[in-house]
């Protein structure tokens, strides 16, 4: 496209959740942990900008006292050499920021799980453009509309299923690398 090929994607997503080991964030019986709670957003956004599924997956995870992943560092690379760097945490606030770097521009998306604006910076002259689409307050309505479209047979909505499958494979690979199983998987 007009930005050139995407080379690198960097994403941060950090929330500060109090250590309440019974709540959904840290309780393994409730599928707690950073990967399933917030990582799914980061991995999905990255996969949408990649030409193919990453084949190199490296990561480190720090567990919460319950054993679920509290903080994750994830590095991905696909066959085209596109790389992704993710930093996720449930116990340290950081901006929800995505940076998609291409040959001719980079795109910055703040609050990306519910963003309604992105900033494009052209690398040759530093010129910036803002793109605004939708409303943050309507984020869940958009998810429901996409689900309804996919169920009703809309081909473009069903294409998202391939992305979702890739994201699930990545999350399973990461959990396997960490040797982390939820109680019902043991």
Spans of features found by a protein language model:
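Active-site loop of classical SDR/Rossmann-like NAD(P)-dependent oxidoreductases
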Residues: 131-145, 159
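Contiguous beta-strand/loop segments that form the cofactor/metal-binding neighborhood of enzyme cores
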Residues: 44-115, 134, 145-155, 185
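Surface-exposed loop/edge segments in extracytoplasmic proteins
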Residues: 126-130
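Alpha-helical structural elements of signaling/regulatory helical domains
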Residues: 3, 139, 155-156
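C-terminal helix-rich "cap/oligomerization" subdomain common to oxidoreductases
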Residues: 79, 146-186
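Soluble or luminal CAZymes and related metallo-dependent hydrolases
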Residues: 38, 139, 163
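Predominantly a Rossmann-like dinucleotide-binding segment in NAD(P)-dependent oxidoreductases
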Residues: 1-57
């Amino acid at each position: 496209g007009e930005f050139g090929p995407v080379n690198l994607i960097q994403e941060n997503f950090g929330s500060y959740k109090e250590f309440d080991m019974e709540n959904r964030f840290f309780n393994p019986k409730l599928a707690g942990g950073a990967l399933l709670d917030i990582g799914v957003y980061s991995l999905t956004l990255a996969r949408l900008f990649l030409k193919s599924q990453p084949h190199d997956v490296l990561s480190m995870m720090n567990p919460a006292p319950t054993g679920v992943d509290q903080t994750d560092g994830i590095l991905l690379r696909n066959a085209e050499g596109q790389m992704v760097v993710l930093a996720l945490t449930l116990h340290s606030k950081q901006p929800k920021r995505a940076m998609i770097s291409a040959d001719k521009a980079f795109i910055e998306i703040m609050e990306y799980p519910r963003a309604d604006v992105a900033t494009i910076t052209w690398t040759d002259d530093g010129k910036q453009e803002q793109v605004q689409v939708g409303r943050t307050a309507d984020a869940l309505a958009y998810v429901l509309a996409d689900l309804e479209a996919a169920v009703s047979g809309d081909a473009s909505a069903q294409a998202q299923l391939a992305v979702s499958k890739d994201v699930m494979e990545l999350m399973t690979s990461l959990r396997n690398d960490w040797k982390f199983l939820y109680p019902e998987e043991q």
